[in-house]
Design a protein with these regions (language model features):
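Alpha-helix capping/helix-boundary segments
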Residues: 99-100
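Surface-exposed amphipathic alpha-helical tracts and adjacent flexible/coil segments at the periphery
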Residues: 1-21, 26-36, 51-52, 58-68, ...
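Beta/alpha (TIM)-barrel catalytic core signal, keyed to glycine-rich beta->alpha loops juxtaposed to Asp/Glu
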Residues: 120
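RNase H-like DDE/DDD metal-dependent nuclease/strand-transfer catalytic core used by mobile genetic elements
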Residues: 104
Length: 302
C-alpha cells in the first residue's frame, strides 16, 4: 500500500522552511497573480525557482497553484506564468479554470495538472471527466464523506487528494459568492474577505437565546485521525489548508499529520494553539453534517 503524501501549505519563505524541516512530503504555493490566496506571500519566477531548488534538494515535491478563474485580457500574462512554472522544474500545477488547464497542455504538456478543489468535483463522473481532459490528480471537494471519497478513488483512474486539516467554506469551495456580493472581493479570484466569519444577527431564535453569533462560520476541519483510513482507501495525498497562516501553524500541522500517518499520538492542544476557530470538526468525512460543525453553539437552523 502506497504511503499517503503529506502536502503542506506555503505562503512565504518562512512557511516553506517550516514545512520542509517539519517533514512534509510536498508543498503547494501560489504563483503571483493567478492563485486563490492573493493575500499570501506568493512567488514570482525567480523566487519559485529558488523554492523548487530548495525543496528538491531535500526530496520534497512542489505543486504550484494557478487556481483562479482568469479573464480573457489576462491570457498573455497567464502564458508567461505557465512558462515560468514549467522552467522552474515544479512537479505539478493546481488549476480551476479550464482555460488554464488547456494552456498548460499546449505550452507545457509534460507538466502534471491537478484539478483544484475550487472545481467542486464531488462525483465519480466529475473525476472521470478530468481524467479525459488530461488531469493526473483531482483535489476532491471538502464536502464529501469517506464512502464517497472511497467510491471516487477506487474508480476514477487518477490520483485523489483530500483536505485533512484547515479551514472549511460555509458554502461549497468554488461556489460561494458571498464575499463578491457583499464586498466585491471574489473567492474565485483569490480575494475572499471571509464575511462568513463575522457575527450575524438571527431574529428567529427562541426567546432568551443570543441572536448575534457566528451563525455562518464553520469550525476548522481536522481529520488527522482518519489518515489511516484515507491511506487504506488509496487516497494519494492529504492536504493541509492554510497558506495565509504562520510557519508555526505549518510546523504543528505537518508534525501532527506525520504522527497520524504512522499511528502515533499527536498533541491536539498544540494544533489548537497554532490556530483554531473554537475547536475542530470532521463532520463532512464522518457524514454527520449538523450544527455542531459551526462555531456558535446555537445554529441558525436549530
Amino acid at each position: 500500500m502506497a504511503r499517503i503524501e503529506i502536502l503542506a501549505p506555503v505562503g512565504s519563505e518562512e512557511m516553506l522552511r517550516a514545512a520542509v524541516f517539519s517533514g512534509a512530503d510536498a508543498v503547494y504555493l501560489g504563483f503571483s497573480g493567478f492563485n486563490a490566496r492573493t493575500g499570501a506571500g506568493n512567488f514570482d519566477a525567480d523566487s519559485l525557482q529558488e523554492a523548487v531548488r530548495f525543496c528538491h534538494a531535500r526530496g520534497v515535491a512542489v505543486h504550484v497553484a494557478l487556481n483562479t478563474t482568469v479573464y480573457g485580457t489576462e491570457l498573455p500574462a497567464l502564458e508567461q506564468a505557465i512558462r515560468a512554472v514549467a522552467a522552474s522544474g515544479a512537479d505539478a500545477v493546481i488549476c480551476q479554470d479550464l482555460a488554464v488547464a488547456t494552456l498548460i497542455g499546449k505550452i507545457a504538456p509534460q507538466l502534471p495538472r491537478h484539478g483544484s478543489t475550487q472545481m467542486s468535483v464531488h462525483t465519480l463522473q466529475g473525476a472521470l471527466e478530468l481524467k479525459e481532459l488530461g488531469f493526473t490528480r483531482v483535489v476532491l471537494a471538502r464536502e464529501l464523506s469517506l464512502p464517497e471519497v472511497e467510491h471516487i478513488t477506487k474508480h476514477c483512474g487518477i490520483e485523489t487528494e483530500c483536505f485533512i486539516h484547515g479551514a472549511l467554506c460555509m458554502s461549497v469551495s468554488g461556489q460561494c459568492y458571498m464575499s463578491a456580493f457583499l464586498g466585491g472581493r471574489s473567492g474565485n479570484r483569490g480575494s475572499c474577505a471571509g464575511p462568513c466569519r463575522l457575527p450575524f444577527e438571527a431574529n428567529a431564535l427562541p426567546e432568551g437565546k443570543p441572536g448575534r453569533l457566528h451563525h455562518l462560520s464553520l469550525k476548522d476541519n481536522s481529520a488527522i485521525d482518519k489518515l489511516d483510513k484515507l491511506q487504506a482507501l488509496g487516497v494519494a495525498s492529504a492536504k493541509i489548508e492554510g497558506r495565509l497562516r504562520t510557519p508555526e501553524y505549518v510546523a504543528a500541522a505537518v508534525s501532527a499529520c506525520l504522527a497520524g500517518r504512522e499511528g502515533r499520538a499527536y498533541d491536539r492542544d498544540l494544533l489548537k494553539n497554532a490556530f483554531s476557530r473554537s475547536g475542530f470538526t470532521s463532520g463532512y468525512l464522518d457524514g454527520k453534517i449538523d450544527g455542531t460543525m459551526f462555531l456558535s453553539l446555537i445554529h441558525i437552523s436549530e
